Design a protein with these regions (language model features):
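Periplasmic/extracellular loop-to-transmembrane helix junction in inner-membrane transport proteins
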Residues: 2-4, 31-84
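Membrane-spanning helices that line or support transport/gating and their immediate boundary helices
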Residues: 30, 34, 95, 102-109, ...
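Short cytoplasmic-facing helical segments at TM-TM junctions of multi-pass membrane proteins
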Residues: 152-197, 218, 222
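Transmembrane alpha-helices
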Residues: 139, 143, 175-209, 236, ...
Length: 272
């Protein structure tokens, strides 16, 4: 009961903070509510920062009229494909290189070089290879997700206790059994730690790709609004993307709790 009450109190204060931020935003852009401290024209604040009521009205108009569903579906499809493909390849390559020191040493400078490269500059190349459709956005998202997952899995496998490995080998564990019962459980916590960041990066890859070249998607809607200086629609697009990114992150957290039931929850180790 006490833990449930603490969670409710936390949610209350989180919502209260959100309400406070919205009120402050509204007060900042409504002419006459606050004295002008930067703009010579009191209407300029609304032009540059948007108005929360108009942003909410735009979001409502999108969903009530059905205009956004096709664009949102495209963006979510690109995001989920990039997230899934990047995660699968990141886990596979991370485990392989962690268990193959020779290959890891050989490929180490190349992996570091590609990781240091700003992946956004690859977007024009992907447009040439895959066109302006879903494929180029997925490819860009995969390059962002892959390295986050890869480095976490690589480190997680290498952090396996030598004592645990020695005990498993003494009990006659085969390489496949070691992978399933020792290496993978050790890497799982590292994998889920990376997935929370990967969700946002998958969205970044999809939206940036749409922004640079597309005819559909939420990034395309934001680009069109920017072209006519419609800041309210731009912010509305950001709000929609943020909301769905939080939903996907919540799904990852739910899966994590289901699969990592053996792991102590936050704060339990301190009580022990």
């Amino acid at each position: 009961m006490r833990g449930s009450g603490n969670r409710l109190a936390l949610r209350f204060w989180q919502l209260a903070l959100l309400a406070l931020l919205l009120v402050a935003w509204h007060a900042l852009v409504v002419p006459g509510v606050l004295p002008t401290f930067y703009f010579d024209d009191p209407n300029k604040a609304a032009f540059f920062f948007g108005e929360p009521l108009k942003v909410g009205a735009r979001v409502w108009q999108w969903f009530a009229g059905g205009e956004i569903y096709r664009h949102l579906w495209i963006t979510l499809l690109e995001t989920m494909l990039a997230f899934f493909i990047g995660t699968v390849f990141g886990v596979a390559v991370g485990i392989w290189l962690a268990l193959a020191p020779a290959a890891s040493a050989l490929l180490d400078p190349y992996i570091k070089a590609v990781n240091a490269m700003p992946r956004v500059i690859l977007a024009p190349i992907f447009f040439v290879w895959f066109g302006l459709g879903v494929g180029s956005k997925v490819a860009l998202g995969v390059t962002l997700v892959f390295f986050i997952v890869f480095f976490n899995v690589y480190q997680g496998v290498r952090e396996v206790s030598p004592v645990v490995l020695a005990n498993a080998r003494m009990l006659g564990a085969s390489p496949r059994q070691l992978l399933r019962h020792v290496y993978l459980p050790s890497a799982m916590s590292w994998v889920f730690a990376s997935l929370h960041n990967s969700v946002g990066l998958a969205f970044v890859g999809a939206v940036v790709g749409e922004y640079l070249g597309s005819s559909e998607g939420v990034g395309y809607l934001i680009l069109q609004a920017e072209g006519v200086f419609d800041i309210n629609t731009v912010v509305a697009g950001v709000v929609v993307l943020t909301a769905f990114a939080l939903i996907l992150d919540g799904i990852v957290s739910l899966v994590e709790r289901r699969l990592m039931v053996w792991q102590p929850r936050s704060g339990e180790t301190e009580r022990i």
